[in-house]
């Protein structure tokens, strides 16, 4: 397997920008870190990391070509995913802070839920298709898909952990129920805002 070093470095820079900048996954992980802590968010992190790497692999092995051949499918997925993200944004914004005098019935997102979410994550699809098409020549097929999926797994894990840690670090600052509610509303608004650049992609 021969790897193009110039494309490899370019892909690393692309991955840093795409994985670590705010998007639906990162905003939800930040919110979960504040509301549930690092340990309880681990299944959510793992679902995002493995779910997206799997999506990269499947896209590279042929699913991306289906969307290229039938662009209407990508359009349908884009708006269906946007509708689901709006639902999640409302759920986060309206979530009540924990009541210290009652059992906390809230639950963080599960591994399966986070993994399945990748398939309706609009930014995720833009990243997956862009990654596979722009950096297809990083190595010969199918090694190019393996390299991209492996790097996505690595960067996804680092990005997910860093955003959850940011959320947990805010626990000492966002203590009162009013502050938690304001934070959740802000995260819901940011989640909606993250849809704007993706929905305006041609």
Model-identified regions with their sequence ranges:
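Alpha-helical multi-pass membrane helix bundles of inner-membrane/thylakoid proteins
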Residues: 1-4, 75, 87-126, 172-186, ...
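Juxtamembrane transmembrane-helix termini in multi-pass membrane transport proteins
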Residues: 2-75, 130-151
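Hydrophobic/aromatic residues within the transmembrane alpha-helices of Major Facilitator Superfamily
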Residues: 16, 20, 53-54, 90, ...
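Membrane helix-loop-helix hairpins that form the core translocation module of multi-pass transporters
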Residues: 42-110, 166-169, 196
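Hydrophobic alpha-helical transmembrane segments in multi-pass integral membrane proteins
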Residues: 56-60, 119-130, 189-202
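Transmembrane alpha-helical segments of integral membrane proteins
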Residues: 157-172
């Amino acid at each position: 397997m021969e790897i193009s070093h110039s494309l490899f470095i370019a892909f690393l820079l692309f991955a840093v920008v795409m994985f670590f900048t705010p998007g639906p996954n990162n905003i939800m992980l930040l919110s979960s870190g504040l509301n549930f802590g690092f340990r309880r968010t681990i299944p959510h992190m793992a679902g995002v990391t493995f779910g997206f790497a799997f999506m990269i692999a499947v896209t590279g092995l042929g699913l991306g070509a289906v969307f290229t051949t039938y662009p209407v499918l990508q359009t349908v997925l884009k708006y269906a995913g946007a509708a689901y993200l709006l639902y999640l944004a409302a759920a986060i914004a309206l979530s009540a802070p924990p009541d210290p005098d009652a059992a906390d019935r809230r639950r963080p997102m599960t591994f399966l839920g986070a993994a399945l979410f990748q398939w309706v994550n609009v930014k995720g699809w833009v990243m997956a298709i862009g990654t596979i098409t722009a950096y297809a020549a990083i190595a010969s097929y199918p090694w190019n898909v393996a390299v991209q999926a492996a790097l996505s797994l690595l960067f996804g894990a680092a990005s997910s952990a860093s955003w959850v840690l940011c959320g947990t670090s805010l626990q000492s600052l966002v203590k009162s129920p009013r502050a938690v509610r304001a934070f959740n509303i802000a995260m819901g608004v940011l989640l909606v805002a993250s849809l704007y650049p993706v929905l305006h992609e041609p």
